[in-house]
From Swiss-Prot:
Signal peptide: none annotated. GO terms for molecular function: large ribosomal subunit rRNA binding. Forms part of the ribosomal stalk, playing a central role in the interaction of the ribosome with GTP-bound translation factors. Pfam families: Ribosomal_L10. GO terms for cellular component: ribonucleoprotein complex; ribosome. Keywords: Ribonucleoprotein, Ribosomal protein, RNA-binding, rRNA-binding. It comes from the Bacteria. Belongs to the universal ribosomal protein uL10 family. This is Large ribosomal subunit protein uL10. The lineage of its organism: Bacteria, Pseudomonadati, Pseudomonadota, Alphaproteobacteria, Hyphomicrobiales. Part of the ribosomal stalk of the 50S ribosomal subunit. The N-terminus interacts with L11 and the large rRNA to form the base of the stalk. The C-terminus forms an elongated spine to which L12 dimers bind in a sequential fashion forming a multimeric L10(L12)X complex.
Length: 172
C-alpha cells in the first residue's frame, strides 16, 4: 500500500468507527478464502460489512473516536465487522463463529462502550431493532383491537336481539 492509500484507508476506517452502531473484532487465522467470502456475503446480506485491516492502521484510525478503548484488541490476524444496527454485526459474527472454529471473537465496541467477547455474545442474543419495533408495534396495536372488539360487541348483540324479535314476530 502506498502512503496516500494508507491515509485514505485510515480516514475511511475512522469514519466507520465513528458512524457504526457496533464494531466487532475477531481473529480469522486459518480461515479459507471461501469461508471468508461466505462470511462477507452473510454480513452484507444482514446489512453489515467485514474489513481486514493492518493492526497498526486500525489503531491509528481508532484515535479520536469513541471506540478508542478497543485498540488493545488488534493483535494477530484480525478482522473488523461493523453495522449501523447495533445488533447485526455481533449476531452475524457469532452465528458464523458457531459453524467455523477459525473465527474467534476478541471483543468490540458499541458507542462509547468497549465490549469483551462475552459482551459481544450477549449482544448477539438480543433481537434486532426491526424485531423490537415489530414487537412494540404489536403491543401497541393489541389494546386498539381489543377496544374495537368491545365497542363493536354491543352493536352486534343489539343486531342479534333485533333478529330474534323479528323471528319471534314471524313465528307468531
Amino acid at each position: 500500500m502506498e502512503r496516500a492509500e494508507k491515509r485514505e484507508f485510515v480516514t475511511e476506517l475512522n469514519e466507520v468507527f465513528k458512524a457504526s452502531g457496533s464494531v466487532v473484532v475477531a481473529h480469522y487465522a486459518g480461515s479459507t478464502v471461501a469461508q471468508m467470502n461466505d462470511f462477507r456475503s452473510k454480513m452484507r446480506a444482514a446489512g453489515g460489512t467485514v474489513k481486514v485491516a493492518k493492526n497498526r492502521l486500525a489503531k491509528i484510525a481508532l484515535q479520536g473516536t469513541e471506540a478508542e478503548g478497543m485498540s488493545n484488541l488488534f493483535k494477530g490476524q484480525t478482522l473488523i465487522a461493523y453495522s449501523n444496527d447495533p445488533i447485526t454485526a455481533p449476531k452475524v459474527v457469532m452465528d458464523f463463529a458457531k459453524t467455523n472454529d477459525k473465527i474467534v471473537v476478541l471483543g468490540g465496541a458499541m458507542g462509547t462502550t468497549t465490549l469483551n467477547a462475552e459482551a459481544v455474545k450477549s449482544l448477539a442474543t438480543l433481537p434486532s431493532l426491526d424485531e423490537l419495533r415489530a414487537k412494540l408495534l404489536g403491543m401497541i396495536q393489541t389494546p386498539a383491537t381489543r377496544i374495537v372488539g368491545v365497542v363493536a360487541a354491543p352493536a352486534s348483540q343489539l343486531a342479534r336481539v333485533f333478529a330474534a324479535y323479528a323471528k319471534k314476530d314471524e313465528a307468531a
